Design a protein with these regions (language model features):
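N-terminal glutamine amidotransferase
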Residues: 1-108, 112
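Conserved small/polar residues in nucleotide/adenosyl-binding loops
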Residues: 115-117
Length: 117
């Protein structure tokens, strides 16, 4: 199975380097749940940014911006889909109207062709 983790720092209590360090610890601790891919979704300049790579967390180096204070992370153990195809790795981008969002899940989705958002 995979792991989902995150950080919310609305008051900007931590600077970008401190957030990076904390997320590194969280993601590396989550490697026991998946080493096939690591990904992050975060805010920057009022927009959603998704950064993901087909590597274990200890090989992924996240660089955050000072305004990035809401971050979601995911470590993946591939059970379906090629881990080298980054489209299969989390988080996934989504959009409803003008609202962008990131999605990560734990488990296998069946009948994806029937899913509607």
């Amino acid at each position: 199975m995979c792991a989902i983790f995150g950080l919310i720092d609305y008051n900007h209590t931590l600077n970008a380097k401190q957030r990076e360090k904390l997320l590194r610890v969280l993601s590396e601790e989550c490697e026991v749940r998946g080493t096939d891919a690591t990904g992050y979704a975060f805010n920057h300049n009022g927009k959603l940014t998704i950064y993901k790579r087909p590597f274990a967390a200890h090989k992924v180096h996240l660089r955050l911006h000072d305004d990035s204070n809401v971050i979601m992370g995911h470590t993946r153990m591939a059970t379906q889909g090629n881990k080298l195809d980054n489209r299969n790795n989390h988080p996934f981008p989504g959009k409803v109207g003008n609202i962008s969002f990131a999605l990560a899940h734990n488990g296998v989705l069946h009948k994806i062709g029937r899913a509607h958002v």
